[in-house]
UniProtKB/Swiss-Prot annotation:
Molecular function via GO: adenylosuccinate synthase activity; GTP binding; magnesium ion binding
Family annotation (InterPro entries): Adenylosuccin_syn_GTP-bd, Adenylosuccin_syn_Lys_AS, Adenylosuccinate_synth_dom1, Adenylosuccinate_synth_dom2, Adenylosuccinate_synth_dom3, Adenylosuccinate_synthetase, P-loop_NTPase
Matches recorded under PANTHER family: ADENYLOSUCCINATE SYNTHETASE
Protein's name according to its UniProt entry: Adenylosuccinate synthetase
Subunit structure, interactors included: Homodimer.
Length: 431
């Protein structure tokens, strides 16, 4: 049976939640493999809106196993709150439908405090634009081998030792930032209190998933954010603190790379970005405002207004290469309805030279200027289209040109937030 990885191929907010939900109906397991609760998914099912940050999108589908892998950093208090909210919407969540990898690092209150203090202390031009939820510092502790992990919650003595090790690092850091030392006993008490609520979902996820694979079950690997926020291949330092590209799916849950049969890149028909960092095709004019208003471009987590621009084929071609994308799901095509002329970024001008990729150095990225190709728009609506025959001729030409420029075919086309408004070209789950 084919297993599918879903990754964002831009800066996040591409519409992954809808596509994952659309695919999850045919998957047996849905697994989150990286990120934290800094990335939000909005799902619309039968007119009901679900907003998820920490939970995999599969939880709203009955009879599926949802998994939070070791590549995720988990805020246990946020997770329990989110579970309660989703349960209140009539969704059943139990240890039979949700598993958390025992080796998943936890986000502690000290991580959020450090995250926010650093952003406040940063001078203009050095702010990353984080959500302030502690994801970056939690990953720092993971790499620094001082994380409190899910399994540590099962034994108080081990838990206290882990907390003490973390505070040896955090207290001097906090002193330098002018923050009070951590109340060690209060933190331990908080963790002891939350422990039973988390431990009932704890499992050796690597073992469970490998058994599911041998049994021929279909696994859908769900990424958060977007490949341009990848810690290695994104617009560093304006990136997230984890690997976002498809290769992380294997290490983020504990399966081999051979478990991945198809990589689906989610791509918006235009470009958006939240927070700081380079954005060559950004629009500060009426067209950019129109894209933002029509696309309802406000962050699910922060409510921050997203920066908007024309479709950047250079960036998407690059992320399709680094993630090994087999096909893309092109979303929000309907937002482009009514534009008389559309532009696609097909290259950059950097210090008088033409570039066909985004350079690595941050100062070079900041100086890249877009080279555009113009295409005629369309006046008819594409919203709700469910077949190619429903699309205006110029919309089809736009999609075909995108395919040519990014060297990757369109596998799915999304024309509204409703999961049924999807045109299937290639089935990612096909064996």
């Amino acid at each position: 049976m084919a297993n599918v990885v879903v990754v964002g191929a831009q800066w996040g907010d591409e519409g992954k939640g809808k596509i994952v939900d659309w695919l999850s109906e045919r998957a047996d397991v849905i697994a989150r493999f990286q990120g934290g609760h800094n990335a939000g998914h909005t799902l619309v099912i039968d007119g009901k809106v679900y907003k998820l940050n920490a939970l995999p999108s599969g939880v709203v589908r009955g009879g599926k196993l949802s998994v939070i892998g070791n590549g995720v950093v988990l805020d246990p208090w946020h997770l329990i709150k989110e579970i309660d909210i989703i349960r209140g919407q009539g969704v059943d969540i139990s240890p039979e439908t949700l598993m958390i990898a025992e080796n998943t690092p936890l986000i502690l209150p000290i991580h959020g405090e450090l995250d926010r203090a650093r952003e406040e202390a940063a001078s203009k031009g050095t702010k990353i634009g984080t959500t302030g939820r502690g994801i970056g510092p939690a990953y720092e502790d993971k790499v620094g081998r001082r994380s409190v992990r899910v399994a540590d919650l099962a034994d108080t003595a081990t838990l206290e030792a882990r907390v003490d090790r973390a505070l040896q690092h955090h207290d001097p850091l906090r002193k330098g930032l002018g923050i009070e030392p951590v109340d060690r006993d209060a933190l331990v008490a908080q963790l002891v209190e939350i422990a039973p609520h988390i431990l009932k979902y704890a499992a050796p996820v690597w073992k469970v998933l490998n058994e599911k694979r041998r049994a021929g079950k279909r696994i859908l690997f769900e990424g958060a954010q977007g490949a341009l926020l990848d810690i290695d291949f994104g617009t560093y330092p304006f990136v997230t603190s984890s690997n976002v590209i498809a290769g992380q799916a294997a290490t983020g849950v504990g399966v081999g790379p051979g478990a991945i049969n198809y990589v689906l890149g989610i791509v918006k028909a235009y470009t958006t970005r939240v927070g700081e960092g380079p954005f060559p095709a950004e629009l500060d004019d009426a067209d950019g405002q129109r894209l933002g208003e029509r696309g309802h471009e406000f962050g699910t987590v922060t409510g921050r207004k997203r920066r908007c621009g024309w479709f950047d084929a250079v960036l998407v071609r690059q992320t399709c290469a680094t993630s090994g994308v087999n096909g893309i799901a092109l979303t929000k095509l309907d937002v482009l309805d009514g534009f008389e002329t559309l532009k696609i970024c097909v290259g950059y001008e950097l210090d008088g030279k033409r570039m066909d990729y985004l350079p690595t150095a941050a100062d070079h990225q900041a100086r890249c200027r877009p080279i555009y190709e113009e295409m005629p728009g369309w006046s008819d609506s594409t919203e709700g289209a469910r077949s190619w025959a429903d699309l205006p001729a110029n919309a089809i030409k736009y999609v075909r040109r995108v395919e040519e420029l990014i060297d990757c075919p369109v596998a799915l086309l999304s024309t509204s937030p409703e999961r049924e408004d999807t045109i299937l070209v290639t089935d990612p789950f096909a064996d």
